[in-house]
Amino acid sequence: MDYEDLKKRVWDLLAQNIESNYRVAVVVVGHPGSGKSTMAQRLKRDLNQEFQSHLKARRGGLRISAGIAAESLDETVPVASGALVEEARRGFFAHVEDPGFKPHKFYDGDGTAVIFGRGGLPNSVRIASEALDPASSVNIAEVVPMDGFHLSRAHLDHFADAAAAHKRRGAPWTFDSNNYLQLCKLLAATCKWKPAKRPKGETLMETICDTFAQCPVISYPGFDHAAKDPVRDQHVLTGFTRVLIFDGLYLLYDQENWAHIYHSLASTGAVLVVNVTASEETRETRVATRHFAAGLVGSIEEGVRKFRENDLLNAKLIEEHTLGGVPTLILSND
């Protein structure tokens, strides 16, 4: 399969589910250096550009119906005690090695729900009520990257073996898998929302334009490679978002919290999985160059060594522990 075929399949997925699912999910996986994140961003850009080209050419405004209240989305997330909230505000380091910690929420002064897992506030998710603005940029596709759920360096400092945690940063246990899974569950619920019933448009684009709804605004962290840490609220989903592109190394990993991500998304009945592949030589060159550009190493040679001592180990973990029975498309990216 090539990239253009992937893009067509995503449009087809949306068309096939436009009357039953408010959103559809695309899961992009691949080894470090395969180019999965670049592919996810390219897909987001192209889907949005094609939709925006349609908007410029059409006459008439968008139809926006009443939607779902924010409170209904997080109702199954337990409310944190005052002591737990205070602990979160102070850093929340005591739970950093607990993959069984259940995410909790608290409410800011403006009523916004903040959901946090074992990584504390740096990896938190925010849910708010905010009216859609038809005059704003209408992006129907957004990426949901795993990268924003890297545990912060301050949290890695509190591991029993902090040196190993820093050296193996990027391994499954150095992420807030608790809260990334919680985010995936929340977003899977939004995929199952039923779009407003309207006469079907002549084209998929017209049907999309007629079935937008007011939805909770969901913010989640990204990752700043220069600062080497997660950034709160870097990514935002609104009611305009109809395609969710999940991007990450461990989205089909069959251990601890990671093992439940695919099943949560598959429960929507509207999911597509693509594995982006590349040769080990290509991946090594890409990752070594990236490490050097990010200032993580002092030379390309050091970048190669870091790849072999960390990233390659993570790739082998994936090969040994991938969920079975998942229909997966293969996209070669050498």
From Swiss-Prot:
SUPFAM superfamilies: P-loop containing nucleoside triphosphate hydrolases (SSF52540). GO terms for cellular component: cytoplasm. InterPro entries: P-loop_NTPase (IPR027417). The keyword Membrane does not apply. Keywords: ATP-binding, Kinase, Nucleotide-binding, Transferase. Its EC number is 2.7.1.-. ATP binds at residues 30-38. GO terms for molecular function: ATP binding; ATP hydrolysis activity; kinase activity. PANTHER family: URIDINE KINASE. ATP-dependent kinase that could be involved in endoplasmic reticulum membrane assembly. Belongs to the YFH7 family. This is ATP-dependent kinase YFH7. The gene is YFH7.
